[in-house]
């Protein structure tokens, strides 16, 4: 390359120029290999490659990729630091603030979430996604009233906001407003088909209303769609126990424990058919310990 330059440009490439050109090539190779590793799911290797690339040259795109790789390997604080540097370079980028909020949520740093949402709202005050994120921060701090208010704003901005309706329905139910929660559940049921989270919400609402058989029907739909839904087995078992179906409750508890062995801690003593004279009593004790619906 230096010889050709001397022919056509009349000068020889200096050592500094050669070094700079080589570093540029090496940077490009590290960046390309890092992206390839990230796409192949080799996130730890991608982190190493992107880090080496940034040691050679500061590059916003590489920092973006590095933040993604760090999230994949659960190095969340470091991912947040990379996103901070990106946001400093692009302070009006709402999407970056949203990504920072997502990381703060994973870190369970709800105060930071609120701060980021407020910053983003100063830029885009009518963004319903920001309302939902703010609501999640409120929920994390136990402020359900403001969470519902933010979710209602999000729904007012976009009526078909299913995520906001589902979350609002869940929070309303937790607050004891079964009627309002039921309205959200019915809207979701009318506008979606077979969504597990919606079916679970509907089941819990029917149980709160005392409609045990209807609740079981919803739980049946959940486990039919997803035979690995541990919470559905656990909650359906509690309902079955409440209506006197100890055999069904026992079967559900067994399924729950198979899917969630840690749930064994909720059971007093060893839970197995062998060596147990009163398996029904063990089922009742298990549900009293876990108490999903406050059964006495």
Give, region by region, the residue ranges found by the protein language model.
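Structural marker of alpha-solenoid helical repeat scaffolds
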Residues: 55-56, 89-90, 123, 157, ...
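Helix-start (N-cap) detector for alpha-helical repeat units in TPR-like alpha-solenoids
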Residues: 27, 60-61, 94-95, 128-129, ...
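Canonical tetratricopeptide repeat
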Residues: 65-66, 99, 133, 167, ...
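Canonical positions in the second alpha-helix
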Residues: 52-53, 85-86, 119-120, 153-154, ...
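Terminal, low-structured helical/coil segments at or just beyond the last alpha-helical repeat
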Residues: 1-13, 250-253, 258-296
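Alpha-helical segment of the N-proximal tetratricopeptide repeat
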Residues: 19-61, 65-72, 95, 99-106, ...
